[in-house]
């Protein structure tokens, strides 16, 4: 109740970035932490000087500030600093460390960390019409120490369904002049709610913990689940293989580029 987050605005925060992709907690969260640590340091220095102790003897715990023998509510400690003319605002900044890449040698570290996931999908296919359904999907995903399990599970479900649609119903079609015809959801098929697995089971890896420094050792999971949609493509291929006594896997040509609409 004591923390309020406003809409992103360069009128309030210069050079701000949007909350998109997998940047919410990793970038914006760490920048907010950086700003909070600056204010915390100022408060500790002022309160320590007031009590004639060292700043490292000031601790912030459970809504309280312990200053030597004194025990203040956080709001009271803030008021003391305010009356002492201590700045209680700060700008935080964070850029992902350890990331580097050489496009010439194709070597480096393009990612700060990895979020791992596994999916198993069961499908049914009408061999006469090609109509198919996802009967069941089981997913286990690593999210580090989850900040909000409900949000993480929702991200995983959405990313998976998007990936399944990318590999089964979306199609890139150009005309003879090279213009993209399927340029928006109005011109290509995206998954609907009815296309999600009839039995959808998602679990978070309970023993996960980010080895890199992030907010509470969490991991972003906005984009990684997209690739789990490949389990649907492989399941469809496996189902079609049954027609040929499992002698060979058929090539489904997922994500190929076409110059004219399919018949």
Model-identified regions with their sequence ranges:
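C-terminal catalytic domains of large/alpha subunits in multi-subunit enzymes
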Residues: 1-260
């Amino acid at each position: 109740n004591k923390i309020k987050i406003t809409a992103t605005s360069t009128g309030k925060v210069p050079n701000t970035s949007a909350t998109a992709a997998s940047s919410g907690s990793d970038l914006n969260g760490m920048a907010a932490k950086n700003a909070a640590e600056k204010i915390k340091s100022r408060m500790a220095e002022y309160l320590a000087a007031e009590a004639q102790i060292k700043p490292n003897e000031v601790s912030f715990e459970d809504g309280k500030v312990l200053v030597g023998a004194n025990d203040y509510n956080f709001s009271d400690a803030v008021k003391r600093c305010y009356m002492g003319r201590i700045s209680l605002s700060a700008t935080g900044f964070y850029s992902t460390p350890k990331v580097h890449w050489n496009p010439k040698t194709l070597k480096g570290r393009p990612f700060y960390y990895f979020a791992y996931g596994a999916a198993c999908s069961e499908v049914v296919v009408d061999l006469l019409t090609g109509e198919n359904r996802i009967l069941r999907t089981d997913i286990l995903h690593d999210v580090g120490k989850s900040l909000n399990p409900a949000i993480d599970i929702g991200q995983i479900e959405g990313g998976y369904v998007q990936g399944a649609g990318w590999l089964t119903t979306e199609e890139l079609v150009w005309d003879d002049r090279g213009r993209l015809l399927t340029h928006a959801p109005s011109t290509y098929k995206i998954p609907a709610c009815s296309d999600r697995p009839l039995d959808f089971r998602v679990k978070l890896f309970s023993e996960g913990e980010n080895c890199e420094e992030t907010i509470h050792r969490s991991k972003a999971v906005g984009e990684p689940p997209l690739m789990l949609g490949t389990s649907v493509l492989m399941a469809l291929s496996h189902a079609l293989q049954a027609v040929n006594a499992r002698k060979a896997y058929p090539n489904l040509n997922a994500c190929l580029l076409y110059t004219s609409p399919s018949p």
